[in-house]
């Protein structure tokens, strides 16, 4: 599992601002008023591609154990108990408070690895602020201003040095011969029914009540001589609907399952179309770069007119992922199962294919000659060579010059060209563009003795006039 980092502290110290900076999102609501965050909010930090980790933002601990404040404090304590690393966030402008002292006391009882993060140091004397918190006795202290993104890199370095390679808990199977498939979607779209159908037994609890599955459950399957690990995840609800602590943990487990799987099967309900919740889940899959198959459930119960309407809606809402195969199924009656597995195989094969440097360079050369980059304000990008940068998703690293002016339309052209040439289906394709470092940039070109003498003669001629 991915390591888990928890942000803990009293209200209004900037935990949500740090969360947004680490996850490059605005998922956490930020406001000067204390107590805006109440539940746990999970996201994935990929600022360091070598070691992504899950971040959990918690509500401020106000010291009151009654009512809403008490529930918020319990959520924060639960998050800290799950975490591989705790970031104890304090306010550098206001200084240490008695509430900070109380939080530190129970953090020490918890005995989790902890880093002190002093936020809001902009406009202050950093040394003075650090000395005020020195009495807490932390050897690991990061001072930053999350609102201005000052010190975020230092925080990442500190987190990276303290995190284990894998988080606590049971690891998902990493057997290369076993295809890991995560079934994700909104509550009650039929994920557990589908897994039960594939297994031939009622292994998962399936019910018409949304939210029956609360945890991610992994089971092994052998089908047609191939090994699979099927991961049935809890349905992801809209944030406003996720209230119970156990459902917060379910959302966390679903994110972990997406990160650890090789193929994500996004299940949609043919009777409801594509909703905002579906788009949110799809966004999590694309962020993780996982192979994708769209399974449209309850298709058998639709009339011809309803099917035509659903097809039109799918083409409009999911047109931007037209590289993913869509399979029409009935989890209840078992129709479409063979087509579903065939789509999973194609997506998995494309996502995990290993490319040679020679074949991708040949593809880049043909793409470049067929359609060279356009001139942008007199500058033309030059693509010199490319090499594979990894799999799942297939990644290609392109080296050249003036790549900053390479238009997005040309990047899409390259993606489509590589997809067509290598028959890549069901997987995102990523390109990373890198410019070579010019060793002479910013340096003056020294003149030879002959050039210096000529320059002097010219200057005398100019002055003589």
From Swiss-Prot:
Q: Name one GO molecular function term.
A: ATP hydrolysis activity
Q: Which UniProt keywords apply?
A: GTP-binding, Nucleotide-binding, Repeat, Ribosome biogenesis
The reply to whether GTP-binding figures as a keyword in the UniProt entry is yes
Task: Supply the SUPFAM superfamilies for this chain.
Answer: P-loop containing nucleoside triphosphate hydrolases
Residue ranges crossing the lipid bilayer per the database entry? none
**EngA-type G domain location, by residue?**
3-167, 179-352
Tell me the Gene3D superfamilies matching this sequence.
3.30.300.20, P-loop containing nucleotide triphosphate hydrolases (3.40.50.300)
Q: Identify the residues that bind GTP 1.
A: 9-16, 57-61, 119-122
Q: List positions binding GTP 2.
A: 185-192, 232-236, 297-300
**UniProt-listed InterPro entries:** AAA+_ATPase, G_ENGA, GTP-bd, GTPase_Der, KH_dom-like, KH_dom-like_a/b, P-loop_NTPase, Small_GTP-bd
Which GO BP terms sit in this record? ribosome biogenesis
Where does the KH-like domain start and stop, copy by copy?
A: 353-437
One Pfam match, by short name? KH_dom-like
User: From what superkingdom does this record's organism come?
Assistant: Bacteria
Biological function: GTPase that plays an essential role in the late steps of ribosome biogenesis.
Whom does it interact with, and what assembly results?
Associates with the 50S ribosomal subunit.
Q: NCBIfam families, alphabetically?
A: GTPase_EngA (TIGR03594), small_GTP (TIGR00231)
Family of the protein in this entry: Belongs to the TRAFAC class TrmE-Era-EngA-EngB-Septin-like GTPase superfamily. EngA (Der) GTPase family.
The name under which this protein is listed is: GTPase Der
Natural source organism: Xanthomonas euvesicatoria pv. vesicatoria (strain 85-10)
Recall the taxonomic lineage recorded for the source organism: Bacteria, Pseudomonadati, Pseudomonadota, Gammaproteobacteria, Lysobacterales
């Amino acid at each position: 599992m991915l390591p888990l980092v928890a942000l803990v502290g009293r209200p209004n110290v900037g935990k949500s601002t740090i969360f947004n900076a680490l996850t490059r999102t605005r998922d956490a609501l930020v406001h000067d008023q204390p107590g805006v965050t109440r539940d746990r909010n999970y996201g994935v930090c990929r600022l360091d591609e070598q070691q992504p980790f899950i971040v959990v933002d918690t509500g401020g601990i106000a010291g009151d154990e009654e009512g809403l404040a008490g529930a918020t404090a319990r959520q924060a304590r639960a998050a800290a108990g799950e975490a591989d690393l705790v970031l104890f966030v304090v306010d550098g402008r206001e200084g240490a408070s008695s509430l900070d002292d109380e939080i530190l006391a129970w953090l020490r009882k918890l005995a989790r690895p902890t880093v002190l993060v002093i936020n809001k140091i902009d406009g202050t004397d950093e040394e003075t602020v650090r000395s005020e918190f020195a009495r807490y006795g932390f050897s690991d202290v990061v001072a930053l201003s999350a609102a201005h993104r000052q010190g975020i890199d230092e925080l990442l370095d500190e987190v990276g040095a303290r995190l284990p390679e894998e988080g606590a808990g049971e690891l998902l199977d990493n057997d290369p011969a076993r295809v890991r498939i995560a079934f994700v979607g909104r509550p009650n779209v039929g994920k557990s029914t589908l897994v039960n159908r594939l297994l031939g037994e009622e292994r998962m609890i399936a019910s018409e009540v949304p939210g029956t599955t609360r945890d991610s459950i992994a089971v092994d399957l052998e089908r047609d001589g191939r090994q699979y690990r099927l991961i049935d995840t809890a349905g992801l609800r809209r944030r406003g609907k996720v209230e119970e602590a156990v459902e917060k943990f379910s959302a966390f487990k679903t994110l972990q399952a997406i990160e650890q799987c090789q193929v994500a099967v996004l299940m949609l309900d043919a009777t409801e179309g594509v909703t905002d919740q579906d788009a949110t889940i799809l966004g999590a899959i694309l962020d993780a770069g996982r192979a994708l198959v769209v399974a449209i459930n309850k298709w058998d119960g639709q009339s011809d007119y309803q099917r035509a309407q659903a097809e039109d809606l799918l083409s409009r809402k999911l047109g931007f992922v037209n590289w993913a195969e869509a399979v029409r199924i009935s989890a209840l009656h078992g129709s479409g199962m063979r087509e579903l597995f065939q789509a999973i195989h194609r997506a998995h094969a494309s996502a995990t294919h290993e490319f040679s440097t020679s074949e991708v360079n040949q593809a880049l050369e043909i793409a470049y000659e067929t359609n060279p980059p356009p001139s942008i304000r007199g500058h033309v990008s030059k693509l010199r060579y490319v090499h594979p940068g990894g799999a799942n998703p297939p990644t290609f690293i392109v080296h050249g010059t003036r790549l900053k002016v390479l238009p997005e339309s040309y990047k899409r052209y390259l993606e489509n060209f590589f997809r067509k040439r290598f028959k890549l289906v069901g997987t995102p394709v990523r390109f990373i563009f890198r410019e070579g470092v010019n060793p002479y940039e910013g340096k003056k070109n020294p003149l030879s003795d002959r050039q210096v003498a000529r320059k002097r003669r010219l200057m005398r001629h100019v002055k003589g006039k």
